[in-house]
């Protein structure tokens, strides 16, 4: 049986985070606005109007190209892409065809410890289309409504080379690309609200063959999971067809998430079907070296570089560094806590590790439970506030378990740690004389555990410490509790 290789390339559409649209001054805030309120004659496609280029969108595209190692064009232009669809207000889309802003680039992804370099073919700038809302009337007859607020939102298309060989590589590529876009601040890059959209081109070929097979474009994927599942399904479908001697058609297929399958939508278009020609109402762009270097100077530290710095400079594991740098804001928060910290009483590497554990542990857990991001968390728990809580833990004022509960209260109330601890009486009990009586009661209440300890099952001490924590309502110093229990057990 013939062995096949899967070939995948991705076209990622990224809505740019500008205040105004690509070719007019209308607001880009289309998600929270009433339908068809952020419109004007330009984005409505009225005859006789002239578009103007959004400079910020051009800069964001160049910045993205620099972050992905792309060649930046010194000359670029816009073109008309002609096709007929209800969401296209002018009857054509202003896009870029043969002279995009950014040329060849690349992005490295990590697959099971091996680095795979995925080529970037180009990055071009265009305008988004309006949004169709499909509804049904009282008789069940379908109809569609059109919201033109989204029309002409700046849209950047990042086209990869067909360098991915598995659905997992495609997913990893998308996840890393989204992280980079967010680090740059050029887009919110949320798949769920459509600001980060992906079309996938997938084909198969016999292993070792240099020729590409018939390309199938897959659309309607609105999550990383959907991209993975759609490509996995399509990979199996195409291989089955090839094994059965059936011809694979070049077509566009849509992913049906509820049925976990792709369905044919139309035959795949070729470039000449769109009848591209230069946009006559917009001047070409001349991009100087000085402008490019000025944009390069604005580039933030990118996630891969920051992760390596965290590993080398903060002695963190690759796992912890990856979690902390997955979000620029989370990494900023971590470093802000470190800047507030005083590691005079403990080794610096141990202190840094403790801060990292709290940020990737309790802090992230609270955010996930609340459905909040780090910006919302910071409004309630500043880096200085978290640092102060960790100082209280280090000084033995509260134990770690109690501190986690205090942190939850800090987030829900906005109060500082000291206020919450005092109000709820949560200060850790470190006075041996106070803990001795609790230890004696625990031993008296658990004769079976005492007998097991005396028989050499020393791990039972953990259970007894837990009972002391329960008796003290979480306030006992666990280290002192363990010492007292061991002493009492050894003395018989």
From Swiss-Prot:
PROSITE patterns: GATB (PS01234)
Pfam families for the chain: GatB_N (PF02934), GatB_Yqey (PF02637)
GO BP: glutaminyl-tRNAGln biosynthesis via transamidation; translation
Keywords: ATP-binding, Ligase, Nucleotide-binding, Protein biosynthesis
InterPro entries noted in UniProt: Asn/Gln-tRNA_amidoTrfase_suB/E, Asn/Gln-tRNA_Trfase_suB/E_cat, Asn/Gln_amidotransferase, Asn/Gln_tRNA_amidoTrase-B-like, GatB, GatB_C_1, GatB_Yqey_C_2, Gln-tRNA_amidoTrfase_suB_CS
GO molecular function, one term: asparaginyl-tRNA synthase (glutamine-hydrolyzing) activity
Reactions the enzyme catalyzes: L-glutamyl-tRNA(Gln) + L-glutamine + ATP + H2O = L-glutaminyl-tRNA(Gln) + L-glutamate + ADP + phosphate + H(+); L-aspartyl-tRNA(Asn) + L-glutamine + ATP + H2O = L-asparaginyl-tRNA(Asn) + L-glutamate + ADP + phosphate + 2 H(+)
EC number assigned by the record: 6.3.5.-
Cited function: Allows the formation of correctly charged Asn-tRNA(Asn) or Gln-tRNA(Gln) through the transamidation of misacylated Asp-tRNA(Asn) or Glu-tRNA(Gln) in organisms which lack either or both of asparaginyl-tRNA or glutaminyl-tRNA synthetases. The reaction takes place in the presence of glutamine and ATP through an activated phospho-Asp-tRNA(Asn) or phospho-Glu-tRNA(Gln).
NCBIfam families per record: gatB, PRK05477.1-2, PRK05477.1-4
Subunit relationships: Heterotrimer of A, B and C subunits.
Family under the similarity heading: Belongs to the GatB/GatE family. GatB subfamily.
Protein name listed in UniProt: Aspartyl/glutamyl-tRNA(Asn/Gln) amidotransferase subunit B
Annotated source species: Dehalococcoides mccartyi (strain ATCC BAA-2266 / KCTC 15142 / 195)
